[in-house]
Amino acid sequence: NRSALLAGLDTGEIDIAILAGEAAHDGSRREAFWSERVMVALSSSHPLAEREIVHWTDLRGERFLLPAADPGPEICDMLVGRLSVTGVQPDIRMHRCSRETILSLLGDGLGLTVICEGSAGACYPEVVYRPIHGEQGPMLIGYSGYWRDLNSNPALLRFLRFIKSRYALAFDISDSAVG
C-alpha cells in the first residue's frame, strides 16, 4: 500500500520505498530508478492473444479486472485516461483480492488485467502476456525510490550505490546525503 510505505518513511520504520509512478511526499528525496513495460494479461483463447503487441485502441470495449488495493487504483486511472471516449467509460471491475488471484481467473476468459512487466514472469494456466503500445511505442511505467535525506542507515547507502550502478543512474550519493 503506497500510503503505508510513505508513512513508514516518515516514522523511520522503513528506509526506502520503491513505488510505481510518482508520489508527492514532503521530506523525502525521490529519484527515478527504472522503467518497465506495461502488459495486458489475458486468456490464451482471447483474439488479442494472437498478436505480438496490443495497442490501447485494441482494448476499448474489454472488461478489466483489477485489485482494489495498490496498484489497482493507479491502473484504473491509467485505463480511464487511455480508454475513455466521449460518453463511454471502460468496463473496470475492482475486486478485493490479490493481483495473483485475478491472474488465476483470466484463463477462463472472465476479463483482462494490466500489469507491469516484472509481474509477467509468473505462469498461470491459459494466461498470456502482451506488451501494450501507444502512439509513441511501448507503454512504460517508471519506478522511483523515496528516502529521507537524514537517514543514517549504512545499508541504505549501499543499496542506493547498488541501484545507481545497476541501472547506470546519474543521481548524486554521498555519505553525508544519508547521514
Q: For each of these PLM feature ranges, what is it?
A:
Residues 21-22, 44, 116-119, 143:
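Short secondary-structure boundary segments
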Residues 64-86, 153-160, 167-176:
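Secondary-structure junction motif
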Residues 14-20, 95-97, 114-116:
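Short beta-strand and adjacent tight-turn residues that come in two discontinuous sequence segments
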Residues 2-42, 55, 78, 102, ...:
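Short beta-strand-centered segments that line the small-molecule binding cleft or hinge
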Residues 1, 20-21, 88-98:
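Short beta-strand-to-loop elements that line the ligand-binding cleft
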Residues 128-173, 178:
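A late-sequence structural motif
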Residues 32, 39-41, 47, 65, ...:
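Residues embedded in well-ordered beta-strands
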